[in-house]
């Protein structure tokens, strides 16, 4: 089905949860007609404000486990010409479907641990944000501190990069030929080899910068969105205020080739 739009879906907020929650859906690009749906986690009813002792009338009786798809699926073309559609869950599962065979499941493997409450927690594993596709491998950031490379055809892990200080690589990675960029919740931007996961360089963004528009700026935590590569430069926003690993910030940084 090459005339389709694919997207991930979140938790249900009331029970019973529909079969279209916590999964991936395909719709016709012209009509919006549902073509197929795959549910990764059943009966996952969750509301972010219902985790404490004080609950409102709108809170579901069973809250969680919040293991939905918190990121966009990835579409890859394999060397043999076949296509695979991959998704990652907050439970740490990576799954692949055949988008040209009604979403038939090809594999499902756990690569990143995972724990309940993946929306608001870092450190317990799981795939919270998006991934990237390189020349040979696909990549996901691990909520438990790491960057995972795996074969998109089989789901078999190739290598894992874990920073020395065990910070969480919470942002979506960005892949270009030979290099993967990954942002960490402590404000460090890493560049690692796409082949073997060895660190090429890193940069601490939690510092004060002189900006081109004259406004004082300070970097902070990097999470959610990843780097953008364009015109031979790498751009990254730093200052994700929800994470406690580094203070909030307000700066957009651009890196060039020396």
PLM features: what roles do these ranges have?
Residues 8-11:
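Generic short beta-strand segments
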């Amino acid at each position: 089905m090459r005339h389709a739009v694919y997207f991930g879906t979140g938790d249900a907020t009331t029970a019973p949860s529909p079969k279209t929650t916590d999964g991936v859906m395909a719709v016709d690009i012209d009509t919006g007609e549902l073509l197929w749906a795959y549910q990764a986690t059943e009966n996952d009813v969750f509301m972010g404000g219902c985790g404490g002792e004080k609950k409102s009338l709108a809170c579901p009786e069973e809250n969680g486990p919040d293991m939905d798809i918190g990121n966009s699926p990835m579409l890859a073309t394999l060397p043999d010409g076949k296509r695979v559609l991959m998704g990652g869950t907050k439970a740490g599962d990576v799954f692949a479907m055949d988008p040209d065979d009604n979403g038939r499941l090809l594999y499902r493997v756990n690569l990143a641990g995972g724990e309940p409450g993946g929306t608001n927690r870092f450190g317990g594993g799981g795939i919270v944000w998006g991934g990237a596709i390189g020349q040979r491998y696909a990549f996901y950031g691990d909520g438990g501190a790491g960057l995972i490379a795996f074969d998109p055809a089989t789901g078999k892990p190739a290598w894992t990069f874990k920073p020395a200080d065990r910070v969480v690589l919470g942002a979506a990675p960005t892949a270009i030929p030979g290099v993967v960029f990954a942002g960490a919740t402590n404000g460090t931007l890493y560049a690692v080899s796409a082949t073997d996961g060895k660190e090429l360089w890193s940069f601490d963004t939690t510092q004060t910068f002189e900006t081109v528009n004259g406004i004082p700026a300070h970097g902070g935590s990097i999470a959610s969105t990843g780097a953008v590569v364009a015109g031979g430069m790498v751009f990254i926003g730093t200052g994700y205020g929800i994470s406690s690993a580094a203070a909030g910030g307000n700066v957009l940084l651009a890196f060039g080739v020396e």
